[in-house]
Regions:
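Membrane-penetrating hydrophobic segments
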Residues: 1-2, 25-28, 94-99
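The first (N-terminal) embedded transmembrane alpha-helix
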Residues: 1-11
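A generic alpha-helix surface/boundary motif
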Residues: 7-8, 38, 82
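Residue-level signal for alpha-helical transmembrane segments in multi-pass membrane proteins
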Residues: 10-18, 86, 111
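Transmembrane helix-loop junctions in multipass membrane proteins, especially transporters and channels
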Residues: 16-23, 49-54, 117-121, 142-147
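Interfacial segments of alpha-helical transmembrane regions
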Residues: 17-40
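Transmembrane alpha-helix/helix-exit interface in multi-pass inner-membrane proteins
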Residues: 37-53
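Membrane-embedded catalytic cores of phosphoryl/pyrophosphoryl-handling enzymes
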Residues: 59-150
């Protein structure tokens, strides 16, 4: 989860140093999209408390990497990746932002399934939450920008 936190944080720090209010607004939008999505995901994880695939089916699914301690549904890594990719794509609607960020977010989801830590439904739900939060946050940030910047 380094990139979903690091990118908006770095943008915000740079914006503050350069006194660039437009970039700071972008950083706030991207950062709050990720925070909202991850917050919703962790609430759902504990509400559903779904066992991880490698725990439920140890004879069929072999864990790659370290064991996870949180419940499986939905995928937090996928949620954060899609929230970041979507909010970056909304903020900077250029093919050279949209294509790599979408490929990266999809890669995160596939990797989580390949590692045996998530079911496809965990990843699809995480992706939907991430994308949804970024789009909803367009409207939330209109209000937030008035509070923070006016």
């Amino acid at each position: 989860m380094i990139l979903p936190v690091g990118i908006p944080t770095a943008m915000g720090i740079y914006a503050l140093i350069q006194k660039d209010q437009a970039l700071l607004k972008d950083a706030v939008f991207i950062g709050t999209s990720v925070i909202e999505a991850v917050g919703i995901t962790y609430g759902l994880k504990h509400a559903f408390n779904r066992q991880r695939p490698y725990d439920k089916h140890p004879d069929k699914i072999h864990l790659v990497g370290k064991a996870e301690s949180s419940p499986s549904f939905p995928s937090g890594h996928t949620t954060a990746a899609f929230a970041l990719a979507t909010s970056l794509s909304i903020t900077y609607p250029k093919w050279y932002v949209i294509a790599p960020s979408a490929l990266w977010a999809c890669g995160v989801g596939f990797a989580r399934m390949n590692q045996g830590v998530h079911y496809p439904s965990d990843v699809l739900t995480g992706a939907a939450i991430g994308v949804g939060c970024a789009f909803v946050n367009v409207y939330v940030n209109k209000w937030l920008n008035k509070v923070l910047f006016e």
